[in-house]
Every structure is written in structure tokens, then in C-alpha cells.
């Protein structure tokens, strides 16, 4: 059996209530995720879009032992690259803070108002983080303080230089070497075209 670059969302759904009982909604440790390649990111995603965060809202949901906090993050869509997220799209992520109670899930992305991101979305409302490879499916558009240009950083806020290195160890990259959002989106479009051509053969 080959390793999968993303979590089995059905397993997460069944194991979650037991984890919540055991730790009283304090911390959940995520299973180690094998970083997907760029090809896997594009292929696995049901939606790929660039958007700006316009709302972040955490609420208690569920009953009894399955009561937990979900966070809803809404994006104003700037560009759809795969699928159609419409003009506004909301993802649901397990965990968050309501009042003075926090339920934290390690390795999950944290969003705030005004964030500009390119997301690779799968199984929204069905798995605890609806991104391909969890934090690997989020790419942040960040303004470089030295040059003033927008660059792409990954879920760990590390500058991205070469999409072909995804899923493999890459040496440290400086902000000056990072690709722009337009370059990243061009790489996505090329991968989508290549995958469509292979499917048509």
C-alpha cells in the first residue's frame, strides 16, 4: 500500500469523538501528513481559488460527547482556478476559541481578517481541515517588506521558489527568490492543462 499525502477524512470523523472525550476539548494532535507534490495538490483539490478573508467565526456545535468548536472562515473570491467557489466561499475548520474556551488542533492553519490566500480545498464540511494535505493546501500572499512586491509563502510562512520541489526537502529560500502570485497561478493553470490533456488521451 502506498503512503497517502493527505489524511483519511473518514477515519478522522470516527476517531474524533473519542479524542474529544479524552482531552476535554483542550488539544488534539494531528496525524503526521506526508507533504503532497504539486501535481497531487492540483489533482486532489476540488476547488482552487485566490481569496481574501472577510470573516472568521468560531462556534460550539454538536451535542454531548461530540460537542466541539468549529471555526468558519469566509473568503471574498478574487479568482477561481479550479471549480467554482462563487463570489464568496466559507470553509469549516475544527477548533477555535469561543469566549475563554479554546479547542486547539495542531498543524491546522490559522486565519485572520484580511489574509490573502490561495487555497486547495477538498471535502469541505466533511473533514476537520478541508485543505489538501492540511496546512500544505494553504498558500499565503505576503507583501515583502524590503521589495514591496507580493510573494507566495507556504503554510509555514516559508517563501516558495519552485513548485516542483513540493513534497521534497528544499533548502532555505529568501523572500527575494520567492515566486509571485501570478507565477504561482500560472503554474497551477499549466498543471491543470497538463492533467486535462492526459485525461483526454
Regions found by a protein language model. Name each.
Residues 11-201:
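Transition segments tied to proteolytic processing and entry into folded domains
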Amino acid at each position: 500500500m502506498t503512503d497517502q499525502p493527505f489524511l483519511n477524512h473518514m477515519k478522522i470523523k470516527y476517531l474524533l469523538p473519542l479524542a474529544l472525550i479524552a482531552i476535554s476539548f483542550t488539544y488534539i494532535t494531528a496525524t503526521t501528513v506526508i507533504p503532497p507534490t504539486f501535481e497531487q495538490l492540483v489533482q486532489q483539490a476540488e476547488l482552487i481559488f485566490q481569496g481574501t478573508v472577510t470573516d472568521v467565526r468560531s462556534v460550539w456545535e454538536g451535542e454531548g460527547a461530540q460537542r466541539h468548536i468549529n471555526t468558519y472562515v469566509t473568503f471574498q473570491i478574487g479568482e477561481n482556478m479550479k471549480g467554482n467557489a462563487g463570489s464568496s466561499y466559507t470553509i469549516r475548520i475544527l477548533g477555535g476559541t469561543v469566549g475563554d474556551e479554546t479547542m486547539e488542533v495542531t498543524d491546522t492553519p490559522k486565519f485572520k481578517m484580511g489574509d490573502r490566500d490561495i487555497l486547495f480545498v477538498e471535502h469541505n464540511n466533511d473533514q476537520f481541515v478541508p485543505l489538501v494535505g492540511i496546512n500544505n493546501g494553504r498558500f499565503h500572499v505576503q507583501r515583502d517588506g524590503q521589495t514591496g512586491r507580493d510573494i507566495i509563502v507556504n503554510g509555514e510562512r516559508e517563501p516558495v521558489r519552485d513548485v516542483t520541489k513540493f513534497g521534497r526537502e528544499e533548502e532555505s529560500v529568501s523572500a527575494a527568490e520567492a515566486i509571485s502570485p501570478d507565477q504561482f497561478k500560472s503554474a497551477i493553470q499549466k498543471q491543470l492543462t497538463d492533467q486535462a490533456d492526459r485525461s483526454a488521451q
